[in-house]
């Protein structure tokens, strides 16, 4: 990767890189999640998405997150929308000629059934190899930096899946491996086969279920934690109102926490967050990201956006200072018992070890 920071904006130039697990990979404190460029959050323009990714690189973002499934299914697991691998193809186009500027993370295991109406998990060793080859082609790269098992296949021992992933490292097709949405037990079993570099799961002020066991286990094992939805699907930006409605294809339309009977309650502490942010001269989302970055764990959040302006706004969170008392107060505002509703609808929870 390129280490020339001279042309980067002040918002990120001075940010120290974080080493991912025990690997040789190191990234800046905030990455970019690219899923929304292909599905779940309304229409997306491919040209705009490619431009956003390239602007992110210009701004110093060096950690991009995708998956082969992004673009393949709508929120209700119905018919194909953009196509399996669409998001990887977008990223491949965006990073062409700039590969050395990026730590590239993608995932496998989730695939559509033949009728396109459901998603199944496939952790068979033969599928691990097949999926990796396909991702390499779509991304237009020779090596994937960080390869995750997106969801663990309950039909295949995790040791077999991870063993096949370890084989990809030996073959030079992958530099490091990780899991997504795994339980502590699955994490330990997998780590016993091949040291894991990263675990990805949801974590934000709104969703703190990983704090009790997952995060301490990651710290014990030397695994970097990569939170997705660190802004709680825009809830922590201050942009949503209690009466917000979502289009049928929007992930939030079927998410219990965004149901009308829950959303108003869940947004109450956001009003206080907005006031604190105003007093500190920053945006609520920046404050929420700063809180996350200041947790006592190795964490690299990957907020997603389709618009370049929000990439820059998110990066500025690295400049927000919080005292220990401020961190504790903000934590208390979003105590888990104050957030109502499960974090996944049943159709998605079925594939997640820690879905509550």
Tell where the protein language model's regions lie, with residue ranges:
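N-terminal binding-site loop/beta-alpha segment at the start of enzyme catalytic domains
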Residues: 1-102, 356
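Conserved, mostly hydrophobic/aromatic
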Residues: 20, 32, 49, 64, ...
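Active-site-proximal loop/turn and secondary-structure-junction residues that shape catalytic pockets
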Residues: 36, 68-70, 108-112, 148-153, ...
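Glycine/proline-rich, positively charged
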Residues: 111-209, 213, 224
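Conserved short secondary-structure transition element at the edge of the structured enzyme core
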Residues: 169, 261-319
């Amino acid at each position: 990767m390129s280490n020339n920071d001279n042309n980067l904006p002040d918002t990120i130039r001075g940010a120290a890189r974080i080493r991912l697990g025990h690997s040789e990979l190191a990234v800046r404190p905030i990455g970019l999640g690219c899923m929304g460029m292909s599905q779940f959050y309304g229409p997306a323009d491919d040209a705009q998405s490619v431009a956003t990714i390239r602007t992110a690189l210009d701004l110093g973002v060096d950690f991009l997150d995708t998956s082969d499934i992004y673009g393949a299914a709508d929120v209700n697991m119905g018919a194909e929308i953009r196509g399996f691998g669409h998001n990887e193809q977008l990223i491949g186009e965006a990073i062409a000629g700039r590969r050395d500027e990026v730590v590239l993370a993608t995932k496998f295991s989730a695939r559509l059934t033949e009728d396109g109406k459901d998603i199944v998990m496939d952790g068979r060793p033969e599928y691990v190899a097949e999926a990796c080859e396909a991702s390499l082609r779509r991304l237009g790269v020779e090596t994937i930096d960080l390869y995750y098992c997106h969801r663990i296949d309950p039909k295949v021992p995790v040791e077999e899946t991870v063993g096949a992933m370890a084989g990809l490292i030996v073959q030079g097709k992958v530099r490091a491996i990780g899991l997504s949405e795994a339980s502590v037990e699955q994490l330990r079993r997998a780590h016993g086969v091949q040291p894991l570099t990263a675990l990805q799961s949801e974590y934000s002020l709104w969703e703190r279920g990983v704090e009790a066991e997952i995060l301490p286990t990651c710290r014990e094992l030397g695994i970097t934690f990569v939170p997705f939805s660190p802004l709680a699907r825009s809830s922590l930006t201050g942009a949503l109102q209690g009466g917000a409605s979502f289009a049928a294809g929007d992930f939030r339309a079927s998410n219990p926490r965004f149901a009308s009977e829950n959303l108003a309650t869940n947004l109450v502490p956001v009003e206080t967050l907005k006031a604190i942010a105003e007093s500190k001269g920053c945006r609520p989302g920046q404050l929420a990201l700063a809180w996350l970055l200041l947790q006592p764990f190795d964490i690299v959040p990957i907020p997603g956006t389709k618009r370049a302006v929000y990439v820059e706004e998110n990066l500025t969170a690295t400049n927000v200072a919080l005292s220990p008392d401020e961190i504790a107060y903000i934590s208390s505002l979003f105590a888990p018992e104050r957030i109502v509703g499960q974090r996944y609808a049943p159709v998605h929870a079925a594939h997640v070890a820690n879905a509550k």
